[in-house]
Amino acid sequence: GRYDVDAIHMDDYFYPYPAAGMPFPDDNSFRKYGLRKGYSEAQRNDWRRENVNTLIRELKRTILLTKPWVRFGISPFGIYRNKKSTADGSGSNTNGLQNYDDLYADITYWVQQGWIDYNIPQIYWEIGHPAADYITLIKWWDKNANGGHLYIGQDVARTMKADQLTRKMRYERALPHVSGNCFWPANEILWNNKGVADSLKRNYHRYPALIPAYTHMHNRPPKDVSKLKTEWTPKGFLLHWQAEQSPTNPELASYFVVYRFNDKEPIDTSDPSKIVAITRETGYLMPYEKGKVKYRYVVTAVDRFHNESEGKTKKVKL
């Protein structure tokens, strides 16, 4: 509880990835704990899954008791179950390692139970991969999002090597339950591998984005900002406001979004191209343009759960 974090994140390591000819050595643990709980030898895999379930459930419970606004998420291996492994054919049309059967990680169950707040499956394969096709998998995860926050884990190097960034972005953006992407590893973006950063900035991430609200955790927006005013300061022409804030109350304003609209255009805060600042400050220095052009600035407040308030508007001549 000492650190001001937004989320606790776990990667894809639960039970270890299986190695050929090396069964996981948990005989003693199973005899001591599994058999005592009523599991038979034939149910050892169920016992393993319940062990991981307990870990995930208790982590979520502990986070809720400590800082209820902190999110808990997982980036699991990209295949939940292959179709051939499921009696009802509910698995994906893939042929690879499986979370449920090999790592004993029941991802979709965790989402259903509300134990994780977001899911980032690692869909690191290419479009057309013979065992794990990218399109097949993102469609499967979208269909099985179960109302949770779903993001797609992207392998930067493999995507750029196959020249598939444009196609992948187009496909995932067409799916109704996908909220965005997580690019791995970050240094490939920083190094601009094959122009990936340029392409993202130019084509897909041209404007700032707001984090989707975690309404299953808290669904009431904070109070609107008040006393929205302009003032000349030694640093320039300042737009400033007041808001109710507290570091110990996640339902109050945590940060603010500043939008700018031309004088006659309709105000639409769902348009990200109008965002000029996302800030934790209660002021924004506006670019002064000889005082002849009319604009309308809109300021909203956002809480720790990313619920956004209604906007307050100020007409300004710049």
Label each PLM-derived region with a short phrase.
Residues 1-115, 124:
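Polysaccharide-binding and catalytic clefts of secreted carbohydrate-active enzymes
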Residues 5, 116, 178, 222-225, ...:
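Core-facing hydrophobic residues within beta-strands of well-ordered domains
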Residues 104-130, 138, 145-218:
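Substrate-binding cleft of secreted/luminal carbohydrate-active enzymes
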Residues 199, 269-272:
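Coil residues (strongly favoring Ser/Thr
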Residues 199-250, 306-318:
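Pro/Thr/Ser/Gly-rich low-complexity, intrinsically disordered linker/stalk tracts
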Residues 244-270, 311:
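Solvent-exposed loop/turn segments flanking beta-strands in beta-repeat/beta-sandwich domains
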Residues 280-285:
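Short S/T/G- and acidic-enriched coil/turn segments that sit immediately N-terminal to beta-strands
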Residues 286-308:
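Beta-strand-rich modules
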